[in-house]
């Protein structure tokens, strides 16, 4: 016991209820810029962060406690009705990424693509389903083997999903793919070859998910994902096991083309008028992947 505020333990591994004693928040600001003749433009800003629950003051910025944070995670413009071939789709430009899909009880993601800037199209009706596609870029810190020195590398990601494919009553399928490559300079490659920096390896992830909704509310989602290199390594983490390219923004590890598979089942069911039963099961296995934990 701390004889004070509650303390978190094993956030992102044992589950969020009862272990996440923090004040994380998302705040979205949205302003319509244009709306005429079936065409619409909105400016969107998303802020997220944490407000500490230990002290009455909660100033943001550098502080000894290090518990109060805030960032602009999204800042983009989204439009509808401007593309003749996809008038119903959302076309966006700016700091944004494809939609995240969360394993709710664990605060892990089955789909997550971090982005510093990019362009994308969402909810484009093609055939029986809809297409989401995004091309985004992000800089990552590539470390040397001492984990003391780093260099900044630009990466580019293409994220493609075909979703909302109807199967049977209240059941839909999604098929997804993602590929991440680096745009490295000659000096960055030289540091990897001669100065002990970890070699960048392109990484990919493919998968599918099936979502079944229930008559009385609730749903269950089953997903199958396979990945290689650094994304596969993140499948093996016991905390924060989302499909990241890096480990907390740091790129390191000997990635040698190994692959990993992850199976998930999650959902919730309404029992009567007053109770909700939730579930989350994740199973991962791989071969020749780098372990961030050991």
Predicted regions located by residue number:
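Beta-barrel outer-membrane channel/assembly domains of diderm bacteria
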Residues: 1-86, 124, 163-165
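Residues that define the transmembrane beta-barrel architecture of outer-membrane proteins
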Residues: 9, 19-25, 68-73, 111-117, ...
């Amino acid at each position: 016991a701390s004889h004070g505020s509650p303390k978190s333990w094993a956030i992102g591994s044992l589950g969020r209820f009862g272990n996440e004693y923090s004040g994380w928040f998302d705040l979205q600001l949205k302003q319509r810029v244009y709306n005429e003749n079936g065409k619409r433009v909105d400016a969107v800003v998303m802020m997220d962060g944490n407000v500490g629950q230990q002290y009455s003051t909660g100033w943001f910025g550098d502080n000894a406690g290090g518990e109060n944070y805030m960032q602009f995670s999204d800042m983009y413009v989204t439009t509808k009705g401007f593309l003749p071939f996809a008038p119903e789709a959302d076309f966006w430009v700016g700091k944004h990424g494809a939609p995240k899909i969360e394993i709710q009880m664990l605060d892990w993601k089955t789909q997550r693509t971090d982005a510093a800037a990019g362009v994308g199209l969402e909810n484009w009706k093609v055939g029986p389903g809809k297409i989401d596609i995004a091309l985004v870029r992000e800089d990552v810190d590539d470390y040397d083997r001492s984990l003391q020195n780093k260099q900044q590398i630009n990466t580019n990601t293409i994220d493609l999903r075909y979703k909302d494919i109807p199967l049977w009553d209240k059941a839909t399928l999604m098929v997804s793919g993602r590929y991440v490559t680096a745009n490295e300079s000659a000096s960055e490659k030289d540091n990897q070859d001669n100065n002990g920096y970890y070699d960048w390896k392109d990484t990919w992830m493919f998968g599918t998910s099936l979502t079944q909704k229930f008559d009385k509310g609730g749903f269950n989602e089953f997903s199958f994902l396979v990945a290689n290199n650094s994304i596969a390594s993140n499948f093996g983490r016991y905390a924060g096991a989302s499909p990241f390219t890096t480990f907390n923004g740091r790129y390191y590890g000997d990635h040698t083309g190994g692959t990993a598979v992850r199976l998930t089942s999650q959902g919730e069911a309404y029992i009567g008028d007053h109770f909700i039963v939730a579930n989350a099961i994740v199973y991962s296995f791989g071969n020749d992947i780098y372990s961030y934990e050991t």
